[in-house]
Amino acid sequence: MTRPEPNFKRHTARYRARRRAADILFEAESRDVDPVAIVEDRVELARDPENGVAPIADYTREIVSGAAEELDAIDDAIARYLSSEWSLERIPAVDRAIMRVSVWEILFNADVPNATALVEGVELASEYSNDKAAPYIHAVLDDVIQAQSADSPMAPASAEEPAEPAETAETEGDTK
């Protein structure tokens, strides 16, 4: 069964910026080069219309530079929520790039709602990866969001309470 051709016109400018950022992060990892240098090269190439290189959106630049700067924290967050059978290095490079874009938005871009970062990441996975990637990426991103929400000072008090005190309280109640 073949997939229908995606309708790129229905996607927002931000979605297209995320897609381009994932492309650049993927390329940078594949070529072992700095992703910010790729952006700078593309900006220069886009100045001459004869090169056929599309201009780089400001949001693409923001994502790529932010993800490059925070790569260790982003990769740690992703690795923390991978299933025990998987390591970050074992995840397909395209899936890593997509998750890096989404996790950067979740952890470091307060202007993007977490739900938007998650949905757009899953949409990118559906577009670029295999059928199993989208649900897996959804689960990892959801775990990152849940952990970030629990650590947030804006989170409800119940989300900040660890599980042990509740278990201790039940045990203490049983001894009376």
From Swiss-Prot:
<dbReference type="GO" id="GO:0003723">
    <property type="term" value="F:RNA binding"/>
</dbReference>
<keyword id="KW-0889">Transcription antitermination</keyword>
<keyword id="KW-0804">Transcription</keyword>
<feature type="compositionally biased region" description="Acidic residues">
    <location>
        <begin position="161"/>
        <end position="176"/>
    </location>
</feature>
<keyword id="KW-0805">Transcription regulation</keyword>
<dbReference type="InterPro" id="IPR035926">
    <property type="entry name" value="NusB-like_sf"/>
</dbReference>
<dbReference type="InterPro" id="IPR011605">
    <property type="entry name" value="NusB_fam"/>
</dbReference>
<dbReference type="GO" id="GO:0006353">
    <property type="term" value="P:DNA-templated transcription termination"/>
</dbReference>
<feature type="region of interest" description="Disordered">
    <location>
        <begin position="148"/>
        <end position="176"/>
    </location>
</feature>
<dbReference type="GO" id="GO:0031564">
    <property type="term" value="P:transcription antitermination"/>
</dbReference>
<protein>
    <recommendedName>
        <fullName>Transcription antitermination protein NusB</fullName>
    </recommendedName>
</protein>
<dbReference type="Pfam" id="PF01029">
    <property type="entry name" value="NusB"/>
</dbReference>
<dbReference type="InterPro" id="IPR006027">
    <property type="entry name" value="NusB_RsmB_TIM44"/>
</dbReference>
<dbReference type="GO" id="GO:0005829">
    <property type="term" value="C:cytosol"/>
</dbReference>
<comment type="function">
    <text>Involved in transcription antitermination. Required for transcription of ribosomal RNA (rRNA) genes. Binds specifically to the boxA antiterminator sequence of the ribosomal RNA (rrn) operons.</text>
</comment>
<keyword id="KW-0694">RNA-binding</keyword>
<comment type="similarity">
    <text>Belongs to the NusB family.</text>
</comment>
